[in-house]
């Protein structure tokens, strides 16, 4: 893709250990969905995709011109924002597959995702004003899209709270916490819920991830999504801290095993 004129290219982040634990499977599902829904969609629309910390390449001319200069805990996200502010973007190559190792335990996952949210919040503080200024002053849709993406921690909190309220109404039906259920008929809500339940598995199956374990993984995936609520709150609270906690990688796997995934 560099020969086609692209300056920064992110590859497809796959998993080399999706079935080692419920955490590694949930991570894998999240990245499979992101590859198709976030990365491929933005590439098709001409927007900027996002760097993922591994499996990407950058033209040396870009580094020579704008430098690296990323200092927050999510330097991949920060450099993506820097590229967009300099009228560049990240492209996506779905055929360049990287088999990344996912965390095995919830503690490892907590530490890594908290670091992501610390860095994400730090990036939002640094780059939101600049991105919105560029978006409205220059009618730059890429900058606007990146600015909206930096609200991700807030979205995680809102999504988590919505799940809490929904489950609370199931347990305590006589005590309604919100009345959004009255906005549509029960039939419409049934369709919305059905689409939400089927959308993720269909996206993964569309990418030819045919395995009953993956389908079963979608039953625990909502719980993984819910854990983003406390992780995000902790990350926002400690956004000013710069401590890097390394995520251990110990999984040995042969190329033959990878080809069977």
Model region roles, listed by residue range:
Residues 79-80, 109:
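Short, hydrophobic alpha-helical packing/hinge segments within bilobed ligand-binding/sensory domains
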Residues 32-36, 111-131, 198-199, 231-235:
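Catalytic core of nucleotide-sugar-dependent glycosyltransferases
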Residues 129-146, 172-261:
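Juxtamembrane C-terminal module of membrane proteins
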Residues 1-71, 114, 121, 125:
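Long helical/loop segments within the catalytic core of UDP-sugar-dependent glycosyltransferases
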Residues 102-117, 248-251:
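Nucleotide-sugar-dependent glycosyltransferase catalytic core
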């Amino acid at each position: 893709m560099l020969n086609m004129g692209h300056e920064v290219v992110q590859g497809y982040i796959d998993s080399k250990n999706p079935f080692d634990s419920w955490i590694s499977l949930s991570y894998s599902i999240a990245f499979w969905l992101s590859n198709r829904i976030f990365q491929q969609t933005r590439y098709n629309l001409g927007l900027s995709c996002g760097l993922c910390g591994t499996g990407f390449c950058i033209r040396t001319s870009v580094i020579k011109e704008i430098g690296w200069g990323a200092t927050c805990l999510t330097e991949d996200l920060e450099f993506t924002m820097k590229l967009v502010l300099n009228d560049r973007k990240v492209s996506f190559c779905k055929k360049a597959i990287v088999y990344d190792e996912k965390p095995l335990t919830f503690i490892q996952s907590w530490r890594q995702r908290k670091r992501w949210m610390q860095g994400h919040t730090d990036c939002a503080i640094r780059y939101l004003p600049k991105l919105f200024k560029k978006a409205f002053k220059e009618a730059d849709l890429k900058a606007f899209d990146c600015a909206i993406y930096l609200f991700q921690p807030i979205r995680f909190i809102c999504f988590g709270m919505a799940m809490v309220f929904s489950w609370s109404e199931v347990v305590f039906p006589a005590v309604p916490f919100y009345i959004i259920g009255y906005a549509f008929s029960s039939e419409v809500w049934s369709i919305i819920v059905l689409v939400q339940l089927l959308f993720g598995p269909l996206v993964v199956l569309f990418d030819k991830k045919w395995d009953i374990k993956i389908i079963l993984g979608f039953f625990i995936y909502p719980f993984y999504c819910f854990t983003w609520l406390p992780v995000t709150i902790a990350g926002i609270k400690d956004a000013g801290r710069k401590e890097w906690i390394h995520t251990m990688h110990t999984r040995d796997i042969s190329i033959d095993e990878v080809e069977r995934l």
